[in-house]
């Protein structure tokens, strides 16, 4: 699992979806520990465990996490999951798209997570209008960050996010779209509506699903 560069900023929208009274949290891809830093201001008694693939990032995260496991979450041993049996919340902040098989990992977590537990995740939206516009002219070039981040292995839309969690045994209890009022999108959205009509799809749904840059969701065991 490749990671994007560490930074000290946290995802405020993701933070608001984390249960405020969690006793144990596992954050996969904790990077510099910025989210742990902010959550500890809300709930300092929580046991906050970070999982980080990059040793240099893990060292930074140790400033704020109670413990940090340096490992690839997809190859970590079964004992780790046994130790998280009473984990209230798993966090994937822009992480699932970096995994080889996020479907398998979510299914594994479902076997161990308590019925009262939850997964909080932030996931990029590949249906974003800018992606569709670039694909229209064959411009699929990897970049160092953003929707075309070269470290992304998987891509999701609103629909396939629901499918991924449902197939793993979770229901999405709540969610929010991270939508920026970006210039130049209106003409593209008009074209997206026209394209949707041409294939018998709902034009307004197609345009609505093209707005979010990312989705933040909270999933619970089904």
Annotated model-derived regions:
Residues 1-89, 103-106, 137, 159, ...:
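Conserved N-terminal segment of class I S-adenosyl-L-methionine
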Residues 93-98:
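Short catalytic micro-motifs in class I SAM-dependent methyltransferases
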Residues 99-100, 123:
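A structural helix-start
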Residues 100-104, 131:
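Short N-terminal helix/helix-N-cap motif within the alpha/beta-hydrolase-1
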Residues 103-118:
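A short glycine-rich, Lys/Arg-flanked "PGG" loop and its adjoining helix->strand segment in the class I
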Residues 121-142:
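Conserved class I S-adenosyl-L-methionine
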Residues 143-160:
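Acceptor-substrate binding/catalytic loop of class I
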Residues 161-176:
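A SAM-dependent methyltransferase catalytic signature shared across enzymes that methylate proteins
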């Amino acid at each position: 699992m490749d990671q994007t560069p560490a930074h000290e900023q946290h995802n405020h929208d993701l933070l608001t979806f984390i249960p405020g009274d969690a006793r144990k949290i596992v954050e996969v891809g904790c990077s510099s520990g910025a989210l742990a830093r902010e959550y500890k201001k809300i709930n300092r008694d929580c046991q906050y465990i970070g999982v980080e693939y990059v040793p240099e990032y893990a060292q930074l995260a140790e400033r704020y996490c109670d413990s940090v496991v340096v490992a690839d979450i997809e190859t970590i041993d079964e004992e780790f999951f046994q130790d998280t049996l009473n984990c209230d919340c798993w966090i994937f902040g822009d992480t699932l798209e970096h995994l080889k098989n996020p479907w398998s990992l979510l299914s594994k977590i479902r076997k161990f997570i308590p019925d009262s537990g939850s997964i909080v995740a932030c996931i990029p939206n590949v249906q974003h209008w800018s992606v569709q516009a670039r694909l229209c002219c064959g411009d699929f070039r990897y970049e160092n960050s953003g929707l075309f981040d070269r470290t992304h292995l998987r891509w999701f839309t609103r629909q396939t996010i629901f499918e991924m969690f449902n197939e793993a045994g979770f229901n999405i209890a709540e969610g929010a779209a991270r939508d920026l009022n970006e210039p130049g999108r209106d003409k593209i959205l008009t074209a997206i509506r026209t394209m949707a009509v041409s294939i018998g799809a709902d034009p307004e749904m197609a345009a609505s699903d093209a707005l979010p840059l990312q989705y933040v969701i909270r999933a619970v065991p089904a």
